[in-house]
Amino acid sequence: MAPKAVLVGPPGAGKSTIGRRLAQALDLPLFDTDVAVEEEAGRTIAEIFVQEGEPAFRALEEEIVRKAIESHEGIVSLGGGSILSERTRELLKGHTVIYLEISVAEGLKRTGTNTARPLLAGGDPRQKYTELMRKRRPLYRQVASIRIRTDGRSPARVVQQLVAKLAE
């Protein structure tokens, strides 16, 4: 068993929204690792970061991603930072991985000052998002077999393009 597709991308790229719509369009189940982490921990991601720190969160996330990649047959939406894990990047090899690309400006517009996103909280949001993208963009590109820009495109249009690409 393997997922039909795995979505990756930075905060605000549309992983959850596109994931839901793509799963619906393909009549497949969706597995959102951020939701699964919160369900497993019984707390929000922000609470895990505050109470246990990023390393504890990443360890839990890595295990949930592993289970999803090994057993879920639908669409899997990964948390934005999951690709920081070398183990996760290894697990993604051989799978259809869709990188939802977004500009820093659009990402900031979509995420704003969302405190549910602990790595973007506090300080200068533009600087934090730019630095996050500087670190992660090469990793997203490394794991991606399909890249699609989401800037200025409706979720419906992005899903339409992805359905066509997945049918190729």
UniProtKB/Swiss-Prot annotation:
Residues that hold substrate according to the record: D34, R58, G80, R136
Cofactor: Mg(2+)
Primary site of residence: cytoplasm
Reaction equations catalysed: shikimate + ATP = 3-phosphoshikimate + ADP + H(+)
Alphabetized InterPro entries for the sequence: P-loop_NTPase (IPR027417), Shikimate/glucono_kinase (IPR031322), Shikimate_kinase/TSH1 (IPR000623), Shikimate_kinase_CS (IPR023000)
One GO cellular component term: cytosol
GO function term, MF aspect, one: ATP binding
Its EC number(s): 2.7.1.71
Gene3D superfamilies, A to Z: P-loop containing nucleotide triphosphate hydrolases (3.40.50.300)
Keyword presence, Lipid biosynthesis: no
Known pathway: Metabolic intermediate biosynthesis; chorismate biosynthesis; chorismate from D-erythrose 4-phosphate and phosphoenolpyruvate: step 5/7
Cofactor note: Binds 1 Mg(2+) ion per subunit.
Binding site for ATP: G12, A13, G14, K15, S16, T17, R117, R153
GO biological process, one term: amino acid biosynthetic process
Binding site for Mg(2+): S16
Compartments where found: Cytoplasm
Keywords attached to this entry: Amino-acid biosynthesis, Aromatic amino acid biosynthesis, ATP-binding, Cytoplasm, Kinase, Magnesium, Metal-binding, Nucleotide-binding, Transferase
Leading EC class: transferase
HAMAP family noted in UniProt: Shikimate_kinase
UniProt function note: Catalyzes the specific phosphorylation of the 3-hydroxyl group of shikimic acid using ATP as a cosubstrate.
Family to which this protein belongs: Belongs to the shikimate kinase family.
Subunit relationships: Monomer.
Name used for this protein in its record: Shikimate kinase
Organism: Rhodococcus jostii (strain RHA1)
